[in-house]
Every structure is written in structure tokens, then in C-alpha cells.
Amino acid sequence: MAVELKELTKRSENYSQWYNDLVVKADLAEQSPVRGCMVIKPYGYAIWEKMQRQLDDMFKETGHVNAYFPLLIPKSYLSREAEHVEGFAKECAVVTHYRLKNAEDGSGVIVDPAAKLEEELIIRPTSETIIWSTYKNWINSYRDLPILCNQWANVMRWEMRTRLFLRTAEFLWQEGHTAHATREEAEAEAQKMLHVYGDFAEKYMAVPVIKGVKSANERFAGALDTYTIEGLMQDGKALQCGTSHFLGQNFAKAFNVQFVDKNNKLDYVWATSWGVSTRLMGALIMTHSDDNGLVLPPHLAPIQVVIVPIYKNDEMLKKIDAKVEGIVNKLKAMGISVKYDNADNKRPGFKFADYELKGVPVRLVMGGRDLENNTMEVMRRDTLEKETRSCDGIEEYVQQLLEDIQNNIYQKALNYRNEHIVKVDSYDDFKEQIEKGGFILAHWDGTPETEDRIKEETKATIRCLPFDADEESLTPGKCMVTGKPSARRVLFARAY
């Protein structure tokens, strides 16, 4: 059933409802019969595929290869790394039986009690344990290192409060798992992959991010350090867009993965893991979109240019078809994804609204008068500005326009982010400022107790200790809550 554009809630009225409306009405995703699991629709999946393709290229350029590991993990594997199991225990889905049978009373299918597994299996919440049990078979000597593997997969975390793309029980992601001979090499890998994520977010998603290291409280379960990229959404909330973890030797020790080093000594392997998920779709939607619908960065838009004819009869349509064919072919030859929508089952006005809703970056329109004048109407989705251009050289103009749109939406998001970072020195000012949204740089005494208190009283968390902090932020001061010494300012926000 067709969706009317007017049904979209305004951001200023209810931002959360606007987001939910937009995901469904732009045909990105919908709820499924399984609580917390979503159906990613073809248009939404096409955006994810473009993200996936670009990230995959970036991983391969940095020497990584793809592999695939089992969905099911023996329960005993999770017990081997105490912090890890503690971090994920409450979210694990457990497989206990391997067979169904028809009920004797004809009431339907039941679990066969005779088919109980000897050991329960966990549907992967993340794959460190199954991968490190495998790496044990692959690694004997320093010559076997490094191992630089990535996996594209689905994972299951039994979330109680779910939202499409942002927090779902099942989601798609990639997870990199690397093994190294030295601590220095592993730490460098974890930071390198964080910078890959940062480059992807800024150059392709047009989402400005702050890179930094997580506090101990916010660290990944089983990691020695967690690095993060943090984006700021239009409602002033932060969104963690990707993380990279330096795991030390924790998993190598848990699974006894040792190697003979260059000095012929036995040592445990050093590890990293890193991942981004379909949560990036949420970041993309919330960073750029407006009350008319999606605003997609051209680098990730499934359709970069749509062409719509306006005609009075079949004869006029044939002439427009002939004129447009050459333009379509030239755009495709430039590597631009273009759709010519001459279907007669929808009126032009409906098509305009639908492509605006779906965030197509550039719309070209040709009518009878345009045909006579050798012109087209050009509309850019980010500003909704229209102009009439000659068809001569329009392909080069559109190519440049797509780059201008990509740069413009990044700059707009960057300006918003920079306007919503403030420094505060007192807890009262912090509590007042956090209600306005945005990032806050403030002093903290470094203790988890103070961090927990701030979270409990304000719902704000430490997003990271930013890498690119200014000199004043790196200067020691006093904790805004306790007055105790603080090594530096850290970045706070309320977050998704």
C-alpha cells in the first residue's frame, strides 16, 4: 500500500516518532513476527550493501581477508573468559534441543524432550570465543602471524527495548578478529581499524565523528582498551558508530593459543577485535534526514539520480524517452546510479514526493517545454533547491552536484556538532546543560563510582576520552562532582 508523505511526524514535534515513521515509510525496514527482530526491506538493504561493499574494500586494502565461523557456540566456551561471559550473559539466546515432533493430542508441534543437547549452544552474541578456539589450530609459530580475519554475519543479543536499526535482538554486522606476535602490533591494529571506521563515517556517510578511548566502565567485556567513534544526532544524543578493542592476551590465555617467537620462546598471542553493524543505518538516517524524508549522502545512495518525465500523450513520452536515453547512458558510464522512472501507474507529483522521502540526492525532470528548449529541471535533495539547466553538459554538472551535496551535508552535520560541544566546570552547570543535549567536555576524577553517579543522576555517560582534544581539555583540573584531581576533560552525552 502506498504511503502518503503527509503522515511523517515532524522532528520538532516528536523526534523519536519521526525516526520510526521514516524508517517504515521510506521502505527501509519493518518489524517482524519475532519480537526484536527486523525485516530489512530491499531499499534499506541496498544502502547496507553499499556500506558493506565500501567497508569490505577498505578492510582488504589494509590486508584483511574474509572468513566465516559458526553461528552456534558451545556454552562452555563462554565460561573460559570470565569478564566476557559477564558482559554478555544476560543477552544470550540458548539452544537446548535439536528436534521437534508432532504432539500426540494433535495440538501442533512440540519440542521433543528426548532430543536434549548434551551441552547447550549459544547463538553468537559476538564471536571471540569460537574464533579463538579455531585460531588455536592455526597458530604454532611467529611465522603464522599476524592473522587478519573479518567476518560478515548476523548476531543475536536478546535486547528488551528495541528500535529498528538502533537496537535489535538480531542484527547484521562485521567483526574483525586479529592475532599478533607483539603487544605493540596489536595496539597499532586496534587503532588503525578505528581510523578506518572514522574515515568511512566521514568520507562516505558524511557523519562527523569524535574518536577516542572508552572509560573502564564502558569498555568491551574482556578488552584492555576499547576505542570508539561517536556521532551526534540531530536530537542532541550521541550514537556510538563503531568500536575497536585491544584484547591483550586474555582470549589467547583462555583458549591456550601460544606460539614460538623469534627467540624460540613460547608466548601467548596478542589480539584485537573490531566491528560495526546495521546501527550505522540509524546514524545515517538521524544525522542528515529532514521532515520531508531521508537525505542520503550520494556516496551511499542506491539511486543517486532519478529522472521523471512529464508528458501529455504517448507521442510526447516517446520523444522524452529518446532524449533521456542518451543522458542515462552517459551518467551510467560515469559510474552514477540512475533511474529513469517513466512508469505510467503513478502521477509525477507522487513520484516527486516518494523520491524525496527516499532521499534520492538529485532529481531531473523533463516536460514538453523542456523538450523544446533542450533543458531539464534539476533539484537537489539536501536543500530542495531547483534550477533549469541546458541538457548540454548536464551529465558533468550532475556529477559535480553529487560531490557538492556530499560535501554540503557533511559540513552541515559538522557545524551542528561543533555548535553543540560545550565545556562546563560545575556539576550544576552540567545538569543544566545536559538537558539541552549535545556533547559536554568536563573534568572527572577517573573513578567508576563517580561515573556511575553521573549516569544515575543525569542519564549521561562518558562517551570517550577524545584523541584530538585541545590543550585546555588536556590540562589537569578538578572533578566537577567530587572536586578531586582530574587528569583531563572527558566527553559526556546522553546516548542511544
UniProtKB/Swiss-Prot annotation:
Reactions that this protein is recorded to catalyse: tRNA(Pro) + L-proline + ATP = L-prolyl-tRNA(Pro) + AMP + diphosphate
Annotated InterPro entries: aa-tRNA-synt_IIb (IPR002314), aa-tRNA-synth_II (IPR006195), aa-tRNA-synth_II/BPL/LPL (IPR045864), Anticodon-bd (IPR004154), Anticodon-bd_dom_sf (IPR036621), Pro-tRNA-ligase_IIa_arc-type (IPR004499), Pro-tRNA_ligase_II_C (IPR016061), Pro-tRNA_synth_II (IPR017449)
Enzyme Commission code(s) on record: 6.1.1.15
GO terms for biological process, alphabetical: prolyl-tRNA aminoacylation
Keyword Transferase: no
One Pfam family recorded for the sequence: HGTP_anticodon
Subcellular location: Cytoplasm
Keywords annotated in UniProt: Aminoacyl-tRNA synthetase, ATP-binding, Cytoplasm, Ligase, Nucleotide-binding, Protein biosynthesis
Job of this protein: Catalyzes the attachment of proline to tRNA(Pro) in a two-step reaction: proline is first activated by ATP to form Pro-AMP and then transferred to the acceptor end of tRNA(Pro).
Family from the record: Belongs to the class-II aminoacyl-tRNA synthetase family. ProS type 3 subfamily.
Quaternary structure note: Homodimer.
Protein name: Proline--tRNA ligase
Organism name: Phocaeicola vulgatus (strain ATCC 8482 / DSM 1447 / JCM 5826 / CCUG 4940 / NBRC 14291 / NCTC 11154)
Lineage: Bacteria, Pseudomonadati, Bacteroidota, Bacteroidia, Bacteroidales
